[in-house]
């Protein structure tokens, strides 16, 4: 009797799982499908990474899976042409052509507010050790934008604000995780330094080296890195107040090994800016330029056109001139906008020089089938021969936002 009841429960449970399985699979597929696709006029919508998925049609005056008319349309993706899965936006547009670079550039950036990068206790006149910043609830990575009536746009402004408070409680406006907050801080007289202090170290600027992905000379915009510029101590993305890019050359490289990412080393060649940074975003740095950059004019691939298999990257590991190296695109995903591809370096020359992907190569263009398909963004710490990439289409969208804002 007990065995029969156990068998019946198992059968019922199995039946429930079998009933739920199709819905779970459809939910998984829904989350993996893109929200938007781009097509050239007359191009048929194909999603080769989703073999059984096809469009049911474009709603509007145009029919089915292609159109000759530039515009935006709603498309219903279906399983096998009959089971609707997801409504997406199909944008029909002329294919963009950009100048593909792969050249190094220097970055000089000033943050919006003073970023807290450390704390140090203070010996007060009473002999006790205190830390006003910690007592006020401030944390590593918080961005202080005002103390009292003083806007803290740089380190000197923080010092000025503490001097103005002169030991009185002052309201502190700061940003944490994108949310503006407030607290009260009371500066303490530092006997050793003979000045008013808060017990926090702040930084208002950053500098580094990256790789330029592409330039659109007609629109006067550039794109690089493929990820945000972050503070080296806190890992927080730097909120941009102003920034510029300058000429740079690569002077050396430390090889990447398992557990220890390598790094390109460079130096700025001039203080003269060759571009102004407008966005420091999760998909890279973008800005305006009227400087002529050398490179090859290439079409930008739409995300659905990127394939697993052989590809190339343009990278500069010495001097100022990029070289082409062979890689393999192992995996493609539409789910994470920051990690669309997993790539593996297979070029022996690059492996012997750098060990694979190293810091400073972020932004190196990824080429496939005569098109710009993406940019290198990160190295896998436990395997320096592999790394992540972002779709070029995503970077192009961001660059076009800069161009539109400058009009």
Describe each region flagged by the PLM.
Residues 9-28:
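Hydrophobic membrane-insertion alpha-helices, especially the h-region
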Residues 110-135, 139:
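PDZ/PDZ-like groove recognition
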Residues 133-156, 366-369, 373-378:
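Conserved PDZ fold ligand-binding element
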Residues 186-359, 368-369, 377, 383-398:
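Serine endopeptidase catalytic core focused on the charge-relay Asp
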Residues 77-79, 86-88, 92-94, 159-199:
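PDZ-domain C-terminal substructure recognizer with occasional recognition of PDZ-binding tails
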Residues 66-68, 146-179, 383-385, 390-393:
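PDZ domains, with a preference for the canonical peptide-binding region formed by the helix
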Residues 129-143, 166, 356-360:
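A short glycine-leucine-enriched loop at secondary-structure breakpoints
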Residues 2-3, 57-100, 278-325:
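Interdomain regulatory linker/hinge segments that flank or connect interaction modules
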């Amino acid at each position: 009797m007990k065995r029969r009841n156990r068998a019946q429960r198992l059968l019922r449970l199995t039946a429930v799982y079998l009933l739920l399985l199709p819905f779970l699979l459809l939910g998984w597929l829904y989350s993996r499908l893109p929200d938007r696709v781009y097509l050239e006029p007359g191009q048929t919508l194909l999603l080769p990474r989703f073999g059984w998925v096809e469009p049911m049609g474009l709603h509007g005056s145009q029919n089915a899976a292609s159109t000759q008319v530039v515009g935006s349309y709603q498309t219903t993706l279906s399983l096998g042409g009959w089971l609707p899965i997801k409504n997406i936006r199909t944008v029909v547009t002329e294919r963009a052509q950009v100048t593909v670079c792969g050249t190094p550039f220097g970055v000089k950036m000033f943050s919006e507010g003073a970023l807290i990068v450390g704390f140090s206790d203070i010996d007060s006149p009473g002999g006790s050790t205190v830390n006003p910043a910690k007592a006020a609830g401030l944390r590593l990575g918080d961005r202080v934008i005002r103390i009292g009536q003083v806007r803290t746009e740089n380190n000197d402004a923080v010092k000025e604000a503490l001097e103005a408070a002169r030991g009185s409680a002052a309201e502190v406006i700061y940003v944490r995780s994108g949310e503006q907050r407030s607290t009260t801080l009371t500066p303490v007289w530092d006997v050793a330094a003979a000045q008013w202090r808060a017990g926090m170290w702040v930084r208002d600027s950053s500098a580094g080296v990256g790789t330029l992905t592409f330039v659109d000379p007609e629109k006067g915009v550039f794109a690089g890195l493929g990820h945000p510029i972050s503070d080296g101590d806190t890992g927080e993305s730097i909120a941009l107040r102003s920034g510029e890019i300058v000429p740079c050359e690569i002077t050396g490289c430390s090889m990447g090994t398992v557990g220890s990412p390598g790094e390109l080393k460079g130096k700025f060649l001039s203080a003269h800016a060759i571009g102004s940074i407008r966005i420091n975003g999760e998909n890279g740095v973008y800005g305006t330029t009227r400087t002529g950059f050398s490179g090859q004019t290439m079409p930008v691939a739409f995300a659905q056109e990127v394939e697993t298999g052989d590809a190339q990257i343009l990278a500069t590991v010495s001097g100022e001139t990029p070289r082409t190296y062979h890689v393999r695109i192992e995996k493609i995903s539409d789910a994470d906008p920051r990690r669309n591809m997993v790539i593996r370096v297979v070029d022996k020359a690059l492996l012997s020089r750098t060990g694979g992907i190293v810091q400073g190569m972020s932004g190196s263009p990824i080429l496939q089938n005569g098109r710009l398909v993406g940019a290198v963004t990160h190295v896998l710490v436990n395997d320096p021969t592999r790394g992540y990439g972002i779709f070029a289409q995503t970077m192009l969208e961001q660059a076009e936002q800069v161009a539109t804002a400058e009009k």
